[in-house]
Regions:
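Membrane-proximal intracellular helices of multi-pass ion channels
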Residues: 1-445
Length: 445
């Protein structure tokens, strides 16, 4: 009797499923955008441009090689908006929502994947959390669209309804895509509305709300203003977010936007402190800003939003944990602390790993683009920070980049959206090693 070898069935980890899901949706989006019906001129869009746009939308970045408003048709804009919504919620969350709506039960493996995708602290209650994410997203996006409706309808008539919905979803998902460009004025973002307090405030609020994270909103909805009952993570996110909003606003007001009325300066300063984390809209000419302001925006872009949110970047908690660990080292304390709680040592190591990974990708991508395009390093650093942190702000060079440089930005956007730890665990596994080697000291600093 012939015995055939038995092959061990390979089981994909939750992290590999997340990456595969993003890649599959990205490819489908690119193929749809290549169709002639997706372009206003009814032409076939080159694959690399379609893939760039699909990746930028799915990874809620906002970098574009074609002006969204003047190049893409209603079908193409619809595909882009769908990709933005899927990317903002997360591919796994959207898949789980469809499974729940169809009446199917969520398996233990699927719950584990959903936990990793939403940055939930435990697997229990993950289905309930998914429902909360869908409800809070619909609430903010519809409310934002209703508030934007008067402005856009006054300028664009009935087309303003589509504009209001598109920009509301794009803002809450921290995508930064806009439809305001024309054949005569492309890539203008929100500059024509720089002095409109309603539109800029609504867009800025949606960006901040989307970047706080769904677990933070669960605490806010559950405990209202009782800050002491929030999770430590939510407290850290809210305090760090406030810090990263107020200080840059003051800087821009005092040193960058020094002309115009006080109201105009406040609106410009506030919006430019919000949008680098990590939306991609702009109400000012970014290329005309001072080098110090541009450097500050690069830092804000890399820091990004909060975990479990629609935003990208290293995340506010990563920044806060590194600061807390540095403060503990200054005080010669063994553990970093927040709000009377000790931070787990693995969180500190993860924060350092994520920061190191983002900075490596940031600098490496800039070197490749600078060498390939013969551009100043400072400009390339701005673009790669925008890509890896999934922001979408640009100094205007992205549409002129060659295929190699666009490929670098595509890779950075994808890696930046799936997350540093997700990528590491998908490649090397997430099971901790049980054996330990002998220890030896090494000099640091």
């Amino acid at each position: 009797m012939i015995q055939y070898p038995r092959y061990r069935q390979h089981r994909f980890s939750s992290f590999q499923v997340i990456i595969a899901g993003f890649a599959a949706v990205d490819l489908v989006g690119a193929l749809l955008l290549m169709l002639p019906i997706a372009a206003q001129q009814r032409c076939i869009t080159p694959f690399h441009e379609a893939l760039f746009t699909s990746t930028s939308a799915l990874c809620v970045t906002g970098l574009v090689v074609q002006d969204t408003g003047s190049y893409w048709s209603a079908f193409g804009q619809g595909v882009i908006l769908l990709l933005i919504q899927i990317g903002g919620l997360g591919v796994i969350t959207v898949g789980a929502a469809f499974a729940l709506l169809s009446g199917r039960k969520i398996s233990l493996k699927q719950r584990s994947t959903m936990q990793e995708a939403t940055a939930a602290p435990q697997m229990g209650g993950i289905v309930r959390l998914t429902g909360f994410i869908l409800r809070i997203t619909a609430l903010f996006e519809l409310a934002g669209a209703a508030l934007l409706l008067p402005t856009f309808c006054a300028d664009y008539g009935l087309r303003g309804i589509w504009y209001a919905l598109f920009h509301s979803i794009s803002a809450f998902c921290n995508a930064g895509f806009d439809l305001l460009g024309t054949e005569g004025a492309k890539f203008v973002s929100l500059t024509r509305y720089a002095g409109d307090p309603l539109l800029t405030t609504v867009i800025a609020a949606l960006i901040v709300f989307g970047g706080l994270g769904f677990l933070t909103w669960e605490d806010i909805c559950t405990y209202r203003l009782d800050f002491h009952r929030y999770r430590m993570q939510s407290k850290v996110i809210l305090v760090t977010t406030a810090f990263l909003l107020v200080l840059p606003t003051l800087y821009f007001y005092c040193f960058e936007f020094t002309a115009g009325s006080a109201r105009q300066r406040i609106l410009l300063s506030m919006f430019q402190s919000v949008t680098p984390r990590t939306a991609g809209f702009n109400t000012a000419d970014l290329a005309a800003m001072g080098s110090t302001s541009q450097a500050l925006m690069v830092v804000l872009m890399l820091l990004g939003g909060s975990p479990g949110s629609t935003a990208g970047g290293m995340k506010t908690t990563t920044f806060a944990v590194l600061l807390a660990n540095m403060w503990a080292t200054f005080r010669r304390r063994e553990d970093a602390e927040f709000f009377g709680r000790r931070i787990d040592g693995s969180a500190v190591k993860n924060a350092a790993t994520i920061a190191g990974m983002y900075l490596t990708l940031f600098f490496l991508g800039a070197f490749v683009i600078a060498a390939a395009e013969q551009l100043p390093m400072s400009v390339c650093l701005y673009e790669t920070a925008s890509a890896v942190a999934t922001v979408g702000l640009t100094l205007g060079i992205t549409p002129q980049l060659g295929i190699l440089s666009q490929g670098v930005l595509i890779a950075l956007m994808f890696l930046g959206r799936v997350g540093g730890l997700t990528l590491i665990y998908a490649a090397f596994g997430s099971s901790p090693a049980h054996s330990r080697l002998p220890q030896e000291k090494i000099a640091i600093g």
